[in-house]
């Protein structure tokens, strides 16, 4: 039976022409064997007397020098597995790089008109135009909304000032009305009732027990009872 490495992802097999040695799992030493099992990183793996790990997964200090790196030390544990993982990751990365990537839009470069020697505006593709239009619409909408909000706030401030002035006028008119009503009431109490006021220098006060006939040319202006 040809020996092969039990480590995950390792495809090394025994070859007399290759300087690779294979080492059996230490089944008679359960604690050390558990470390080997954990190192190979294979789910539900149970080593048998035929299971082995190649020398590629051991560091140099794991071997006995006097045996020409063919025998492991008693406490040796395979720890070199990064190489296989790196190769695996590199293979995936290469596959991803081989996939065709989406073409990125090339920025437009201004051209020079040979006839007049002036820079011409860059030519935009439909995708560039769509992006530019969307961006401009968004900016314009935002600016317009801000201006509109500012206008509404100014209108609200003006209306508040007008309302304040109107309330002040109403309060002044109410005070004026109360003052006039008070003056009228006091005037009535002071003068009493039953007199007539005529225009100019003609007037006559009528009491309850007196009455004088007025001439037709004279008319009264106001009567306060």
Swiss-Prot record:
The keyword Transcription applies. Pfam families: THAP. Residues 139-194 form a coiled coil. One of its GO terms (molecular function) is sequence-specific DNA binding. GO terms for cellular component: nucleoplasm; nucleus. InterPro entries: THAP1/10, THAP_Znf, THAP_Znf_sf. Keywords: Cell cycle, Coiled coil, DNA-binding, Metal-binding, Nucleus, Transcription, Transcription regulation, Zinc, Zinc-finger. SUPFAM superfamilies: Glucocorticoid receptor-like (DNA-binding domain). Its main location: nucleus. Gene3D superfamilies: THAP domain. A zinc finger (THAP-type) spans 5-57. One of its GO terms (biological process) is regulation of transcription by RNA polymerase II. It comes from the Eukaryota. DNA-binding transcription regulator that regulates endothelial cell proliferation and G1/S cell-cycle progression. Specifically binds the 5'-[AT]NTNN[GT]GGCA[AGT]-3' core DNA sequence and acts by modulating expression of pRB-E2F cell-cycle target genes. Belongs to the THAP1 family. This is THAP domain-containing protein 1 B.
